[in-house]
């Protein structure tokens, strides 16, 4: 089992699919990348995200992937719905809120605060290739298209 304190200067990389123990709050708050894959297993994946002020993750859908998101710091508005152009479910979230997104649900998360929004996301099954690291949203969009 790998035990990583991800201290002051963490070595952020994909530690999957070995057992792994770490301080998730610290790792999430230390992450400065738009998306960092920290652990990829056979049936689940953990990513850390940092959304800049006034930024968003972008409207997206995962047809075959359930998603759990927890906000560690910041303020956001969550949008979800069955149609890309009609995200009728909306909620304000901040630190310690959890968001559950069923497979096949369109969604977006918008940072409405003045500080970066720090969150982590669990995908089941994995959504991104092993070791995915996107420094910016633009990097993520380039890779996905």
Give each language-model segment a name:
Residues 37, 46-50, 68, 90, ...:
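Conserved hydrophobic/aromatic beta-strand scaffold that supports enzyme active sites
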